[in-house]
Every structure is written in structure tokens, then in C-alpha cells.
Amino acid sequence: MANNTAAVFTRHYDSPMGRILLAADEIGLRGLWFDGQKYFARDLPEKRIEQETHALAEARRWLDVYFTGKEPDFLPPLHPIGSAFRQAVWTVLLQIPYGQTTTYGEIARQLAGTAGLSRMSAQAVGGAVGHNEISIIIPCHRVVGTSGSLTGYAGGIERKVKLLELERADMTGFFVPKKGTAL
């Protein structure tokens, strides 16, 4: 659940893939959304302060490096807001190497093992991945369906493909599904 009592600062970033809204509080970056994407800034308070902060400046610097096709060697201060389960999924996303991909099922297996469970739902993982509010930096675009389907990116499948191409990920066997978002 979002903490809507903290002051939220915002800045825009013009990327090669479209305009991005960045949001941060005093702790770190809370959101990074392409204008108009699914779940766009939905948990932010209406009253926002358009002002640069350390976290926003670092996020902009990170994006500058990233959009040149290079892997940034630092992370801006992050403050993703979500349940313990979502936080666990987002932590796994941060471990996916630049230019590589994993599946929803593999993340589910990893989390199940860590929690001492025999199994975990890939669909539950997909829900947490889909609600990542710090896209690109917390790289939800690096998660694909088990069959290679490029599904479930709130910024749009076309952007997901472009982000993976920018990272020079091996796209062999990947495809855009005709409909649905099966994991």
C-alpha cells in the first residue's frame, strides 16, 4: 500500500521511447512510468512537487547511461511501495543481469525455494511483476513467458521488445502473442 502522506517530487524525462514521469519521496525513487502506460502514477498523491531531488537526479543520470545502450554501474536510491511479496519479487527482478531474461516460472521457483515452499504460482509472480512501479530500473521487461512469449509489460509490448533489443538480449525464440498474457 502506498504512503500518500509523504511529499512526492516529480520530474519528466524525455527518452528515445517516449516521455517518462519520475517520482520520488525523501527516501528514494517511487515510480518511473511512460506517459499513458497501464497503472500510470496511480498510487501517487494528486499533490506533487515538480522539483529535482537527489533520487530524481540519479534516476535521470541512470537513464542517460541506459539509453546509450550501456549497462549503468550504479542504482539510484529506490523506494518501491508494495506488499512483502511484491517487494520479494522486485528484489529478484533487480538480480536479472542486463541483457538477459528469465521467466515468471523461474522467479516463482526461486522464491518458493527461498521461502521453503514446494511451489509458487507463476501467475502470482506475474501480478507482482506487472505492478512494478519503477519500470526499466527494476527490470520487469526482462521477464518472459515460459514458452518465450513477450507478455505483460505495462509500458507496452513494443517498448518491451525495444528495451530488450537495446540491451542486446538474445531474442531467439521470443514472440509476441496474438492475444492473452499466458505465463
Language model: regions and residue ranges:
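Short, charge-rich amphipathic segments
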Residues: A2, M17-L29
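N- and C-terminal low-complexity/disordered segments
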Residues: M1-A7
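Nucleic acid-binding interface residues in structured DNA/RNA-binding domains
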Residues: A7-R19, K70-L183
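Compact structured core domains
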Residues: A24-L75
